[in-house]
Structures are given as C-alpha cells and as structure tokens.
C-alpha cells in the first residue's frame, strides 16, 4: 500500500507562498506528477526543482477546503490508463510533486513528497485500468483564492470544490469501475460485464415486490435519491421522510443524482475484434471523464448534484407577484412545468414553449436535455448489461388501443359513456387516459379523460359502454374513442426503483428506471440542447443558451452526420471529444438486435424527442430518437420535463 512521508514545500514553493501572503499573486495549481526516483534518509528534498525520475503527469480532479483556511485537499486519480496516456511500462511510485505557476518564474515544483512505502503501478493490461485515488494536503496562503488546472482547463475554486459530504461518500467506498463491453460487429443486445461489475446480478421487478439488484448498493446508484425539490432548488424531503409527497405538494418530485464520471470508448483486441466499452465511477480513471450532465457553460461550471424529473411534466397555474409603475404589487397568473404524480402530462406544445415553462420556475431550471438522456442510457447499459430495455424493464406504456374503425361510437347520446365494439372496448382499463373526437387522434369532443367503468351494453349486441369522468359529451356515430396520454404516478407503489407495474397487459404497464416513470412510453419527451440541420446535429453544453434553430455560438457541430434513413438502431456515431453523444448513423437492426429501438429521421428534422408513446410499441425505448420534426412541432404525444441543477 502506498504511504507517504510528510510533504514539503520546495524553496520555490515557499517563495511563491510568500508572494501570495503579501497579496502579490494567487496560487494557481497546474498539475501533479509521479516518479520513481530514489531518496536517501534525511535528504533535503526542499531544494528540488523537479522530480528525480518523473513517470506520469495528471490533472487535479478537484479540491476541498480543509478546516484550516490555509490548507486545501487536492484530489488526484493516479492511473495507468487515461484519455491522453497509456502506461506501457510499470514502475514503483516513490515520489510525488505538485506544480504551480509563478508569475515571474513560470511553472515550478511547489510541493514534493517521498514514499515511506512505495506501490507498483503496472502497465495497462488492455482490459481494466489500475487506479490509486489520492488526497494531497497542500499549504497555501488562502484556500479560497486557489485555482487549479483540471484536465487542462482553468476553473474557479467555487466551481470545482467538492463539498465535504460528497468527499465523505466517495472516500468511504472503494473507487470502483463499473463497466460493460460488447463486440461491435455482434448483433446481440447482451453486453459483458467488466471491472468491479463482474459477477453482479441486476434484476428488474414486476409489481410491488423486491428483486436482487447488486448495483443499487454501489456508487453512483447508492447515492441517487427521489426527493421533493423547491423552486429555489432546496430539498424539502427525501423518499422515506415523513414529509415526502409524490403529488408535488411539497415540491417537484425529482431524482437527486451525484456527480459521476462516465466513459464510452472503443478498443481492438489482439485478435482484431473491436469492442465498445461503457463505464461509470466516482473518479476520473481510465477513459472516464466527468459526465457533461454535470458541466455547464463556456467555463464548464460543475454542478455537484443534478435533479432529474421522475414524472412527465404537467402544468400548474400559479400566482406570481410583480411590480409596475401603475401598481406597486399585483398578482399575475403564470404557468410552470411540474414533475408530480396524479396529473395528466402536458402536451400540444412546442419544444420552445416547454423550455419557457421550465425557465419560469426560476434560476437553474431547464427543460430536460440530451445530456440527461445520454447519462441515463449509460447507467442502464452498465446496470443491466444489455440494450434491450423493453425486454428487461417491460414494454412500457406503448401498446394501448388505437383504432379509428373499431373505436367508432355505435350509439348517439349525450352523457359520460361511449358505446363501442366489445373486442375493442374491453382492451381499455379503468383509470387509463382516453380522448374522443371526430376521428382517430382528435380531441375535439373530450381530451384527457379517465375511464371510470367498463360494462356490457344492454342495448347494442357485442358492445361495451366505456364510462369516463368530466363533463357529459355529445356522442355521434362519427365519434372515435382512443387512448391518449396516461396520468402520472402509476409506479409510486413499487418497492423497486427498476421494473414495471402489473397492469392490464405488459404493454399497458408503466415502467420505471431509477424511479423515473415512463422513461420510455406514454409520451415522447423533448430533449433540449440539440438542434438539427439537414441531419447534422449541433449540441450545446450551456443551458442558459438553449434556443431553437441555433447552429453557432454556444452550439457546436458534432463530429459526424446522423443517418438519413429511419429504422432500428444498429450503430451510434462516436465523437471522441464528446464521447457520450449517441446519434444513430446506421440502421438495419431489429426490435431484439443491437440497440433494439427505432430511429426516425427526415431532412427537415430540427429537434430531438426520445422514448416513445402509447402507440409506438416495440420501437419504443431509451435509445429511440424522433429526429424528423421541426422546432414548431406540437402534438398530443409530445411532452417535456423540468430539470434542475445545484
């Protein structure tokens, strides 16, 4: 086990510290370095200007201010495999240095430590990186004024400091690499577990029972928690607290997600077989980087926690106070998008309109985006080691009755029920959402009603009467009964965070993944942060800059062009700079091969919508992308969800 003697400030480091104490400069940490140099007992290491035998250089992951204002704790992951370097020859780690920028001298060795007990860093074996997670205590003049270079980018301390709670969480657990891999050319949806995920059993539940899921006790899943979030982003309660509420009365129902490192990369083995890898961890090891769900803005501000919506968004009308020249204070009604159980999802709005409904909630509220979509995809693949979510979690709410002929009313009346063919009407379920209109998918007569009863007709042979709530409706023989969006909250009785409820049929049963209901199915979800122009996707990692039909500035061009034909996803493109981005470049798979979900594309497509709806069936799933609609598209099966950040 690697153990260190007390670290020392070098002579140059002391001089820089004196300048900082005199207010002439601040301490800017640039990098860390390991080496294999030998030191004799009592050797004066303070005079060193470099390590004796430097071997590897690493960025500083983040820093924490200790109880002493003049000390910071630097976090460094020493590994034999990073995005920029692969260690080909192993060595004994015997020396360690921290470098800083001196305004007169340039980069200097600021602090040095020698090992009392060395540790061997092996060469990378081509499968699993070795990592030593290190905390280095460093003397500075004022910890608040220290900046660090992280992965080559300068960031303010306020953006990169890890709160003590997170440090405690990570350091009490072994840094793990939970990973999977698949042969790129193999059509199977199954992946092979690697790293610390080997041997884990992960199952999804059906109904309200519990099942074995080993990964839920490992970071980051062990630290994900449903919560009630106020509009100022204060957590009012966590699931299990006496005050926690699913219905939104104590705040939006959100999933608190801790800062997580993810990776997606490709390697070819000695036999010439190309593999795709996915992995997650609490630390920056191997090919992993801080997932871009947690970064924001041109300076890559870091959010220690992100809050993802558990339910499709529903609209709440609230009273807001405002001030004008004529009236000092007045009340104004505004609409906001809420994540809560027991409501019909909002729909028939454009992506831009959903964006406004989210931003109206306050600072750091946004429309849920492509970064959350990609992050959850990786979490699913790592947890269940496959890309067939419908086969694992269930079909989702994707197979509801929709028929413009069988759904025609067989009797005219004004009331709260419609008479339809028995074989069609009996496919509906009590409590499900329906609409009635002059034709299939028309809501001209009744929108988003709930079925209250289904019984045989006493007046029409081979027919049933489907009763619904709300005001009476004038039914004619041109009226059509069909399944529209479904109310939220179907999964709140489940004990397991992953799986499906026991509905009338599997295809009418809501699924949840990490407590997130209707992750696919029920209603398509707009995903902000990605604008499309003639199959070229432009991404944005600055949420304040999200806008429709923008292709420059904060939006950057993804390093490949999307596929031009629709079909089941066979291949996602790969941009090494933004490795988590998954855009279909090749179809030709099926509902049970490769990625198992359907991709829609058209030359005029401008926005991204994910998941599927009540009528999309086997093509639905987390990897299904609807990229064929304009920014002005709005329809009954397009919805959105609010996302929040610390």
Which role does the model predict for each range below?
Residues 1-150:
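N-terminal assembly/attachment segments of tailed bacteriophage virion structural proteins
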Residues 38-39, 103-105, 260-262, 313-314, ...:
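Acidic glycine-/aspartate-rich tracts in secreted/extracellular proteins
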Residues 85-162, 260-269, 273-302, 311-322, ...:
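Beta-strand-rich solenoidal segments
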Residues 158-172:
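Extended alpha-helical stalk/coiled-coil segments
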Residues 171-256, 262-264, 365, 473-475:
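GGW-centered surface loops in extracellular recognition modules
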Residues 248-251, 282-444, 448, 454-519:
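Short aromatic-cysteine micro-motif
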Residues 371-374, 378, 396, 522-532, ...:
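C-terminal, surface-exposed recognition/capping segments
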Residues 533-544:
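A short, polar/charged loop-to-alpha-helix boundary motif
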